[in-house]
Structure formats: structure tokens, C-alpha cells
Amino acid sequence: MMIIGIDPGLEFTGWGVVSSTNSQSVCLLDSGVISTRGISRESEKLYKIYVSLLSVLSLYKIDEASIEKVFINSNPRSSMSLCYARAASTISVMSRGIDIYEYSSTAIKKCITGNGMAPKEQVSFMVRSSLGIKQDVEINNHSSDAIAAALCHVYNTRNRNFALK
């Protein structure tokens, strides 16, 4: 099963594609960041996120997607921007007929690290450890968070399938 994880953001949208086999192994196939820095119009940023994710989705036979839920913070403007980026990401995935699953950042962190309030560095460390990614391989926080979302879905799917047996 191939899963794409998405960490939406208006400036930086992280993505990570993992493959999970029946033998319980998971491997990272690819990851990256869609940057909209230098683009001033919000509509153009959203379009770039949409088109760039479509491009990534065309490279792999993705079975399911996992995306971080939006949390509402004290700054309404940044919350709205995050909602827009999430919508552009969701539409990209849904337009390919791929089921998308949503997890809160707390649920993702708890699943990956055991601590729902874990700092980004701890999430990144556990992502690297879980997938055997060497320290010299560059993965930024946006990609790491997206990979964590994908791993969270893999682990939750395994638990659901185990419970059904």
C-alpha cells in the first residue's frame, strides 16, 4: 500500500510517500516541500500547491492519503491561510479518487513519539529512526511532519485491520 502524507501550509506544504507491505515493513519512497515563497497573491500560492501535489500524485500509485487537521490558533489570519492550503491539498488528492484520512497534530505526534506535545525535533528523530533514514539525508520539518502523518495512517490502518481479524 502506498500512502502520501501531507503537512499543509500556505508558504510550505510538506509531503512524503511511504510504502507499507503485508510483512509490516514501511519504507520511504520520496518526500519534498512545495514552497510558495516569492509568490505574493494568495490565489497563485493555492494554485501552485494544487498543481504541485497533482504532479507528485502522478508519479506514484497512491492508495490513500493522510493529512494533518487544521487547528485554530490565536491568529485568525494564519488559521485561515492554513485552511486554504489544506483545501488546495485535499482537492488535489480527491481529484485523483484517493481516499484521504485526517489526523490532528497531537494524534500524529502521540502515534509517532508517544507524546502528543512532542517538539518537531523529536518527531523528526522518530521518523528517521522508524524508517532507517541516515542523518546525512536532508529532511526538513515540513517533510518530516508529512512523513509522520503517513506513518500515523499506516499504524492506525494496521491496528484497525488487526482488530477486524
Curated annotation (Swiss-Prot):
The active site is at 7, 68, 142. Mg(2+) 2 binds at residue 68. GO terms for cellular component: cytoplasm; Holliday junction resolvase complex. One of its GO terms (molecular function) is DNA binding. It catalyses: Endonucleolytic cleavage at a junction such as a reciprocal single-stranded crossover between two homologous DNA duplexes (Holliday junction). GO terms for biological process: DNA recombination; DNA repair. It is found in: Cytoplasm. Binds 2 Mg(2+) ion per subunit. Pfam families: RuvC. Its EC number is 3.1.21.10. Its cofactor is Mg(2+). Mg(2+) 1 binds at residues 7, 142. Keywords: Cytoplasm, DNA damage, DNA recombination, DNA repair, DNA-binding, Endonuclease, Hydrolase, Magnesium, Metal-binding, Nuclease. SUPFAM superfamilies: Ribonuclease H-like (SSF53098). InterPro entries: RNaseH-like_sf (IPR012337), RNaseH_sf (IPR036397), X-over_junc_endoDNase_RuvC (IPR002176). HAMAP family: RuvC (MF_00034). PANTHER family: CROSSOVER JUNCTION ENDODEOXYRIBONUCLEASE RUVC. Homodimer which binds Holliday junction (HJ) DNA. The HJ becomes 2-fold symmetrical on binding to RuvC with unstacked arms; it has a different conformation from HJ DNA in complex with RuvA. In the full resolvosome a probable DNA-RuvA(4)-RuvB(12)-RuvC(2) complex forms which resolves the HJ. Belongs to the RuvC family. The RuvA-RuvB-RuvC complex processes Holliday junction (HJ) DNA during genetic recombination and DNA repair. Endonuclease that resolves HJ intermediates. Cleaves cruciform DNA by making single-stranded nicks across the HJ at symmetrical positions within the homologous arms, yielding a 5'-phosphate and a 3'-hydroxyl group; requires a central core of homology in the junction. The consensus cleavage sequence is 5'-(A/T)TT(C/G)-3'. Cleavage occurs on the 3'-side of the TT dinucleotide at the point of strand exchange. This is Crossover junction endodeoxyribonuclease RuvC. The gene is ruvC.
